Amino acid sequence: MGLKELYESLSSEQREFQFGRIGVNPLTEGFPRKRVVHAGIDGTPVNPREAQKIWQGLMSKKPTGKPTQTAYIHIPFCKTKCLYCAFFQNGTDQAVEDAYVDSLIKDLERECHELRLKDGLIHSVFIGGGTPTSLSAQNAERLLRAIRTCLPLANDYELTLEGRIHDLVPEKMDVWMAEGVNRMSLGVQSFNTKVRRQVGRLDDKDTVLRRLEELQAYNQCVVIIDLIYGLPSQSMDVWRDDLECLMTSAADGADLYQLNVYDNSDLAKRIQAGALDPAATTKEQARMFEFGREYLMKRNCRRLSAAHWAKTNRERSLYNTLAKTGVTMFPFGSGAGGRVDGYSTMLYRTLDTYATAVEEKKKPFMALVKESDIQPLVNKTLAQIEQGYFNVDLLVGEDPRLSDLKWLYDLWEKQGLVENNGVLYKLTTAGEFWQVNLAQTTVECIQYLVKGVESMSLQGVAAQDGAETKAVSEKVEKIIAAMKKAKSSGAGPTPEAMKMMTEAMQSMSPEEMQEVMKHMGK
């Protein structure tokens, strides 16, 4: 059965959810709601008893040539929790932070001697969180020196430190610039003081602009800010002012992200209680996206990927681009994720469990998954769509069974989501807004055409439109129950739990995944 026959066999609800709506405004109504892209499909969990041996085997082999590679380092601390955030792990405590950095450096020092790492090159390092800039100046110095000592950085490496405006103080900035940070990614979210403080940001508009100038005065790094559209009290006029502030600020570029409100999140509870104005609906966010896109393009900003824009020629957004292509990503730190030579992994989220594994000279992962043999096709697909296009012929050249994808993209052309320029399909403005939906459905269709597996699901994503979603699904509850059973028996994570986790990763929202991660390794 081809894609057309599959399409015709679906219920009207599932047809619209997977393939989009016909005869509507494609920008505001192209799909019923946003989806989540699940890049890893059909993976096979490794038996926990064999996982360490397999990892050691991977790391003991020399890389083939000098492939482009990245490293992700996770700092799981925040001084405050922003209402919209699904990734908060731990508050700050100096003694806990000191001990964690000790463990993180040991993890780096142990792995740096492995051939797979030391004989290659690292082109991009991303220190994410959490709030990495919350580290004390001393701990930041220790960690950055360990990174430059342990990782084989390429001459043109990008080293990004993620953080918040409130941490931009001289004693910290001096260390960051002296120890090799050449890109700062800062969560501004909005320049509007009221909007910022409503969601947990501390500094007012003038302070934000001043501190960006103070950071840029070092002239040692790219300065990037995150802006979110759709926040409570963020009208179109406020959004316009945010974009104007971006253009006049010292930032070299920005990432424009759509707000998703998840049921049972702190933000949703505050809105439901009447303490905050409602967030923008998806239709309103679509118009904000369109306005932001046109505003930046008219001012000659360069589009680097779906959400990333450059104001100056210093910004490359290298890590963000490479992460979408499936390149090797060496993970370090509690909660970090990565992939090496056909295997993906997630490191322990619980600090004590992470530290214990490091002391035992083990890679501190809670799960190791062998990727599907069609993962390379998926990676190429996601990399293209992230850049705003899709070339069917390139994929058909690798697997003729994918020729039916032309039917899918011809359908989307009729719906106003893509345009065929004679060589490939370019996403329209509407297609760019619904890019995650196009990407996920394309991945599912690839799996269907190559594997004969229909894995399309109707999971909810955001609650800003009043849609009913569960913060903890039945699948999540089953995984947690299995992990608790393993803990009580002392046996550790079972193959059954690993299998369920792998399957769940294909269909869960970020909120659901975070709920699982809270319990993995406890």
Feature annotation, model-predicted:
Residues M1-Q69:
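Flexible, acidic/Gly-rich N-terminal and inter-domain linker regions that tether
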Residues S334-E468:
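Charged, E/D/K/R/S-rich low-complexity terminal regions of large eukaryotic assembly subunits
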Residues A463-K522:
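Extended, compositionally biased non-globular segments
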